[in-house]
Amino acid sequence: MSEFLTVAFYKFVELQDYAELKAPLLACCQDNDVQGTILLATEGINGAIAGLPHNIHTVLDFLCGDPRFADLAPKESWSEKRPFYRMKVRLKKEIIKMGVPDIDPTQTVGEYVKPEDWNQLLADPDVVVIDVRNDYEVAIGTFKGAINPNTKSFSELPEWLQEQAELQKKPKVAMFCTGGIRCEKSTALLRHEGFEDVFHLQGGILSYLEKVPEDESLWQGDCFVFDERVAVGHGLKPGRYQLCRACRTPISPEDMKSEHYVPGQSCPHCYGTKTEEQQQRFAERQRQIELAKQRNQVHIGAKYSRHQPG
């Protein structure tokens, strides 16, 4: 039975006092044995945390006690193991980094499309569908026919969008991402640039996988998530991927059969790209992880990801 509850949430809202929120929020999470990452900025909050259900609800109650977060809509999923090893509350310039000034999702965004209605939009020949996630995410799963921008980070997307003549040829643009936050900014950017018929998947891929039956789904593959689960599939069940600890790339069961796969040290995606010093460091880290497992302990040095949640 799944024991740990993971919740992902975000909200764009003006937080001039965001720095003052860090200490009490971190203390609340630590007091309730909750792990994960929460980002705070003047533009809002973005987080993913996990713990025992009653502890998670205590933290959410604490958050929603602030009127600015009263309508927070966390997305839930379950796991048998802790998906995070640490609790971090970080202060940022943006809760999801795009790097474009004057883009304010509280003022204008694309039209939300419910997961139940998303298939109909995808079938519209007048719609350009864009996966706004990064290349390593798209590589393990996406919607059929979606355009892959081949970006390494979300901050590369604005430049890519400016170069796309295809967007001028069709009257409608639809975007999707993991949980919705990147679409808030990317659709706001398109609206800012004068596009009128802009849509995005409400609640992101995670809501689609949760609400749309697998036999009706147009999703292909797994959805990368920013924690130790690495990926989830339909019904938000654990996917088939693990994470290469050397390069942070999702690796499939087929990748793990490669002669270039050494647990914690290399995979087919990064074999031969690391220095001898890095290889020695990775080998020692893996040794510590294995020792911790033998002692039935968690090696907190095994970070889940270098990326932001969202």
UniProtKB/Swiss-Prot annotation:
The keyword Hydrolase does not apply. Transmembrane segments: none annotated. This is tRNA uridine(34) hydroxylase. It is an enzyme of class 1 (oxidoreductase). It comes from Acaryochloris marina (strain MBIC 11017). It catalyses: uridine(34) in tRNA + AH2 + O2 = 5-hydroxyuridine(34) in tRNA + A + H2O. The active site is at C177 (cysteine persulfide intermediate). GO terms for molecular function: oxidoreductase activity, acting on paired donors, with incorporation or reduction of molecular oxygen. PANTHER family: RHODANESE-LIKE DOMAIN-CONTAINING PROTEIN 7-RELATED, THIOSULFATE SULFURTRANSFERASE/RHODANESE-LIKE DOMAIN-CONTAINING PROTEIN 2. Its EC number is 1.14.-.-. One of its GO terms (biological process) is tRNA modification. Residues 123-217 form the Rhodanese domain. Belongs to the TrhO family. Coiled coil: none annotated. Keywords: Oxidoreductase, tRNA processing. InterPro entries: Rhodanese-like_dom (IPR001763), Rhodanese-like_dom_sf (IPR036873), TrhO (IPR020936), TRHO_N (IPR040503). Catalyzes oxygen-dependent 5-hydroxyuridine (ho5U) modification at position 34 in tRNAs.
